[in-house]
Amino acid sequence: MKIIIVCYPTFGGSGVLATELGHQLAANGHSVHFIAYEKPVRLKDNDETIFYHKVNVPFYPLFNFQPYELALSTKIVDVAKKNSVDLIHVHYAIPHAYAAYMAQKMLKMNSINLPIITTLHGTDITLVGKHPFYKSAVKFSIEKSNIVTSVSQSLKNDTHEFFDTQKEIEVIPNFVDIKKFDNQLQKCSSQDSKMTITHVSNFRPVKNIRTLIKIFSILSGKFDCKFNLIGEGPELEIARSMSEDLQIKNIYFLGNTNEVEKVLCHSDIFILPSKTESFGLAALEAMASKNAIVSSNSGGLPELNLDNITGFTCDYNNIQGFVS
């Protein structure tokens, strides 16, 4: 098959999952065309089965905000026509599913009928989708998609509740390439005697970064341990400032990386105290790296991290619970 994948190109879970899915589809003999405003950070295009198409948004002074959705719809139509595409798979409802629906209608005018699969990832429903400015558009996009999938049962339930829709939603959990993590573990030889605790995120407020730093502060005073923080985002500087004010020892801000497995293989514990988390792909990557998981019990995390089995869970604001 020839498949279009539309996703965000960033380090967030939806973009990473979409990219890894494309790689696996290509490995199984399909041609995959990625469409985004930048090349996805983990994408390895090969000019044979994986292709990247950039969405360019022309600047017009008339527009206060440039119309990305229109440019995306047009790019989907262009790629579909030129490559005889069979399927459109969009990750994150807004604006991708909305733009795909418009592209689908334009293609029908040329007697081209392409189905749309929309995968819901979390904040497209729990944050963006709940906003009154976007709620109607999100509901419309979901109901007009041919197939809708969700990364967790929790997110499926939230979608039905928030949007009062009866649209059938299939739960397909996120995945990782176990072979990649196993190969890295075999190469990994850490001589560090310190217990290493790692956090990976985009440092948005929903990731509960301030609580995370407070947890690190208490642990730093009790144990000889090291803290690795991977990622960048709006609360990164707050985290740096708090760690300095609290005089946390052995805390390292490592920035973004395309090879998270090379850091996680040196880690013992992975912590994710998110206020809400529809799946928690970073936690799954940490599991593949043989980390014990300590996470909040929010959203879909309890479906992934089973308390007292794969790790431990507690309320996201329970600092002492995380420390224990």
Could you describe each region identified by the protein language model?
Residues 71, 108-117, 123-141, 178:
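Nucleotide-sugar donor phosphate/pyrophosphate-binding loop at the beta->alpha transition
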Residues 61-87, 97-102, 132-136, 140:
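An amphipathic, basic-hydrophobic alpha-helix
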Residues 292-295, 305:
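Short hydrophobic beta-strand element within catalytic cores of glycosyltransferases
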Residues 307-308, 312-319:
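Conserved acidic donor-binding segment of nucleotide-sugar-dependent glycosyltransferases
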Residues 149, 191-207, 213-216, 228:
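Conserved donor-binding/catalytic core segment of Leloir-type glycosyltransferases
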Residues 154, 175:
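Carbohydrate-associated surface elements
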Residues 1-41:
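N-terminal subdomain of nucleotide-sugar transferases
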Residues 256, 275:
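Aromatic "clamp/platform" in nucleotide-sugar-dependent glycosyltransferases that forms part
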